[in-house]
Amino acid sequence: MAKRGKNKIEWDNTDWEQEEEEIIWVSKSEIKRDAEALKKLGEKLVDLTKAKLEKIPLEEKLLEAIELAQRLQKEARRRQLQYIGKLLRNIDVEPIQDALEKLENKHQQQQAMLHKLEMLRDTLIDNPEAITQFLEQHPDADRQHLRNLVRAAQKEKAQNKPPKAYREIFQYLKDFMLED
């Protein structure tokens, strides 16, 4: 047992392993990279529309800063983005990143669906058996309307006319698939 002044320290009873705190060293470069990543997250938030911003869990102060940055230009916008990055450093950004990722993923899913519909439309026009297969898979589809549109699109294609029925098939397929 060691004594020091008025304070008594009992060395035998002290468990050094429990009292040691882990010190995590972070390099200056890593801090800068993290700050830059948060600034880029702030830029993504500033580029969103007001409707999309409402779907993301943001603190009031951060939301006000983002709305202000949307109105600013040039150097003032750059300074405001720095400020948004600073605000993001003080909060947990994981829920914000998750919500932003969901919004971006939803857009990609919509693009993929539209691409599939375009391919289906082309298949329906080029292959007469594809209409029968489509109608077997989707018995709720309007058989007569779809066949008429396909015939009209084939006729337009043969006569080099503007693709009015071609667009109507896409719109019909899009409306039909969204109902399901």
Swiss-Prot record:
Pfam families found in the cross-reference section: DarP
One annotated Gene Ontology cellular component of this protein: cytosol
Keywords linked to the UniProt accession: Cytoplasm, Ribosome biogenesis, RNA-binding, rRNA-binding
NCBIfam families, sorted: PRK05255.1-1
One MF term in the entry's GO annotations: rRNA binding
Species the sequence originates in: Pasteurella multocida (strain Pm70)
Function statement: Member of a network of 50S ribosomal subunit biogenesis factors which assembles along the 30S-50S interface, preventing incorrect 23S rRNA structures from forming. Promotes peptidyl transferase center (PTC) maturation.
Name by which UniProt lists this protein: Dual-action ribosomal maturation protein DarP
Subcellular locations according to the entry: Cytoplasm
Example of a GO biological process term: assembly of large subunit precursor of preribosome
SUPFAM superfamilies tied to this protein: PSPTO4464-like
InterPro entries tied to this protein: DarP, DarP_sf
Main location: cytoplasm
Keyword Metal-binding set for record: no
UniProt similarity note: Belongs to the DarP family.
